[in-house]
Swiss-Prot record:
The active site is at H83. This is Alpha-hemolysin translocation ATP-binding protein HlyB. It comes from Escherichia coli. The chain crosses the membrane at residues 158-178, 191-211, 269-289, 295-315, 388-408. The keyword tRNA-binding does not apply. Its main location: membrane.
Length: 707
């Protein structure tokens, strides 16, 4: 209990949960306002503190089996003060992912372990933005607001559908009159009138049908544009962790599922639903003709539905398998094209071809199974339709022979029945497409339902100066992955040039990713000018941080467009100045098109060293206050590197510079050198100071390179 008084886990939990909901919180202010006796936040004071941050909170009692239905993360409250945050429940394996506030680590608990800790009290917490985001979850309900938005167009479609159904109702009556009246009484004048009337009906029916298709296609195209635009914006707003945890081909395959949704929206599915809505009117008229024949049609409808319901789960599983195999093919194809130089150099084309053939065969086999099952489904529908037709023919003929029904009425009845059965059959067949679209929506939902980097509610501060502080940083990429950074404490002053060295995997690059706010540490704070980056607007930060990586990607544009990428309206003079600092101006001037030269896809038209120098110019052109070189000169030839190092004084002037390098000669002139090993800072100092310690890791690495 003493430890609980020393550390207020309730306050720590509130800080974490508020941060999750993009709400800024000052722990000291909360403690001052609500922890009046200094013993920590009790349940009542915790709820009041959360509400003061405009969070929606509710304390409830829930049994463990009811926790599957709550909105996570939530705070599990314990009487002894050792609260913890419940973040995820895996129903399939009965495991619980929690954040242990005492250990400051995520933990995976088995059912028995969780039962031992859980006391039945849990606090649900949301914010207005969280609730809105939840309601905006992408699934089939996403289209409801879109339909409401374009309700006028859909109402027009509905009105046109009403007239089309009225025409469909009138046409059989004309045929009945011709069969029962005109042919029997030889009424040529009546025949002429009916022919003219029927011709008018047909013309209007064709016009209205085309108009309905046009209106509907126009509205669905708008929805398609909105969805496509939303998808791309959302994709670019996703955090870097989303892309690092998924294969490129898998993401591309999910985005391409938009085509399936587009085809479904612009098809006949929804118009068939509208046609089916008018079935009650047709049933009333058909009942007037013959209750017996109507009952046959009526009883056939559940048969169509039952057959579709029977086929659907099997079809969905096979469609899911087909998608997974297609995603594997996409990933392998992207990987092969990207690594084509390696494949050619290693002469492994036959092996890659064999792998592709096997994967392609699996995909084709999965597609064939889908086709076979879809064919069985369609033929089952046809069987029901033909059976109903035979029964109606037999029963209708009996009714005509017995005098209960005229020939004209039988023909009219069959035409009306066709108006009911046709949309049912179309829907039964479209149901298979609906299964495909259901999977497409689910797959696309993986993209659209993934949380983006938060920009709203974040601090947008003035121009940064360049002071950087790492305070008690502990970080890992996944809850179950090894710790990458452990208890990092480091202060970097404005204008200081820092070199970071160490073995591969020691956490050097991860440190710079935290500066760019690609990730939030699981413990501790990254501060710039005293401002916590967890509460800062990522765009505000990244616009003022220049980064050069070992492998930089150039876009398929001109050189000037690549350098001025973040500010297309930048003057040519600034672009040229940055290029000169980066040692790129001379080779650019020698190109036929100069700065207007198109670099090709990913800069394929340039050498590795040329691409790197353009990337350095791109990082410098916005005059960032913080500059990060992550193995930036390792791909340069010695002449290019000499130009960069010669200009390093100008490059570093007025900036905080962090240089990550394996080649220690690159950092020997740095103001301070940080040596990292297994996620920890083990040494720091100037070049000569570190070499003066013969047993130091830096001396060992330097000796290896000297040899």
């Amino acid at each position: 209990m003493d430890s609980c008084h020393k550390i207020d886990y309730g306050l720590y939990a509130l800080e974490i949960l508020a941060q999750y909901h993009n709400v800024s919180v000052n722990p000291e202010e909360i403690k001052h306002r609500f922890d009046t006796d200094g013993t920590g936040l009790g349940l009542t004071s915790w709820l009041l503190a959360a509400k003061s941050l405009e969070l929606k909170v509710k304390q409830v009692k829930k049994t463990i089996d009811r926790l599957n239905f709550i909105f996570l993360p939530a705070l599990v409250w314990r009487e002894d003060g050792r609260h913890f945050i419940l973040t995820k429940i895996s129903k399939e394996v009965n495991r619980y992912l929690i954040f242990d506030l005492e250990q400051r680590n995520p933990r995976v608990l088995e059912q028995s372990e969780f039962e031992a800790l859980y006391q039945g009290h849990i606090i649900l917490i949301t914010s207005r933005s969280s609730v809105t985001g939840k309601l905006a979850k992408f699934d089939f309900t996403w289209f409801i607001p879109a339909i409401i938005k374009y309700r006028r167009i859909f109402i027009e479609t509905l009105v046109v559908s009403v007239f089309l159904q009225l025409f469909a109702l009138i046409t059989p009556l004309f045929f009945q009159v011709v069969m029962d009246k005109v042919l029997v009484h030889r009424g040529f004048s009546t025949l002429n009138v009916i022919t003219v009337a029927l011709s008018v009906v047909v013309v209007f029916e064709i016009i209205l049908s085309g108009l309905r298709t046009y209106i509907f296609a126009h509205s669905t195209s708008r929805i398609d544009v909105e969805l496509g635009a939303k998808l791309f914006r959302h994709l670019l707003a996703l955090p870097i962790s989303y892309f690092e945890s998924r294969r490129v081909g898998d993401t591309v395959a999910r985005v391409r599922e938009l085509d399936q949704i587009r085809n479904f929206l612009t098809g006949q599915a929804l118009t068939s639903v509208l046609d089916l809505l008018f079935s009650l009117i047709f049933f009333a008229v058909m009942w007037y003709y013959s209750p017996k024949l109507t009952l046959v049609i009526l009883f056939s409808l559940p048969c169509y539905a039952a057959w579709s319901v029977f086929i659907s789960p099997i079809l969905r599983r096979r469609l899911d398998d087909k998608f997974s195999r297609n995603a594997d093919n996409q990933s392998f194809l992207v990987e092969s094209v990207t690594a084509i130089n390696t494949i050619k150099a290693m002469a492994v084309s036959p092996q890659m071809t064999n792998i592709w053939d096997k994967q392609l065969a699996g995909y084709v086999a999965a597609g064939f199974k889908v086709t076979v099952l879809a064919t069985i489904g369609q033929q089952g529908i046809q069987l029901i339709q033909k059976t109903v037709m035979i029964i109606n023919l037999w029963l209708g003929a009996h009714l005509v022979i017995s005098g209960d029904l005229s020939i004209g009425q039988l023909i009219a009845f069959n035409m009306l029945a066709g108006q009911i059965v046709a949309p049912v059959i179309r829907l039964a067949q479209i149901w298979q497409d609906f299964q495909q679209v259901g999977i497409s929506v689910t797959r696309l939902g993986d993209v659209l339902n993934s949380p983006t980097e938060s920009y709203h509610g974040k601090l947008t501060l003035p121009e940064i100066n360049g002071d950087i502080t790492f305070r008690n940083i502990r970080f890992r990429y996944k809850p179950d992955s090894p710790v990458i950074l452990d208890n990092i404490n480091l202060s970097i002053k404005q204008g200081e040039v820092i070199g970071i060295v160490g073995r591969s995997g020691s956490g050097k690059s991860t440190l710079t990713k935290l500066i760019q706010r690609f990730y939030i540490p699981e413990n501790g704070q990254v501060l710039i000018d005293g401002h916590d980056l967890a509460l800062a607007d990522p765009n505000w930060l990244r616009r003022q941080v220049g980064v050069v990586l070992q492998d930089n990607v150039l876009l398929n544009r001109s050189i000037i467009d690549n350098i001025s990428l973040a500010n297309p309206g930048m003057s040519v003079e600034k672009v040229i100045y940055a290029a000169k600092l980066a040692g790129a101006h001379d080779f650019i001037s020698e190109l036929r098109e100069g700065y207007n030269t198109i670099v090709g896809e990913q800069g394929a038209g340039l050498s590795g060293g040329q691409r790197q120098r353009i990337a350095i110019a791109r990082a410098l052109v916005n005059n960032p206050k913080i500059l990060i070189f992550d193995e930036a000169t390792s791909a340069l030839d010695y002449e290019s590197e000499h130009v960069i190092m010669r200009n390093m004084h100008k490059i570093c002037k007025g900036r905080t510079v962090i240089i990550i390098a394996h080649r220690l000669s690159t950092v020997k002139n740095a103001d301070r050198i940080i040596v990292m090993e297994k996620g920890k800072i083990v040494e720091q100092g100037k070049h000569k100071e570190l070499l003066s310690e013969p047993e130091s890791l830096y001396s060992y690495l330097y000796q290896l390179q000297s040899d």
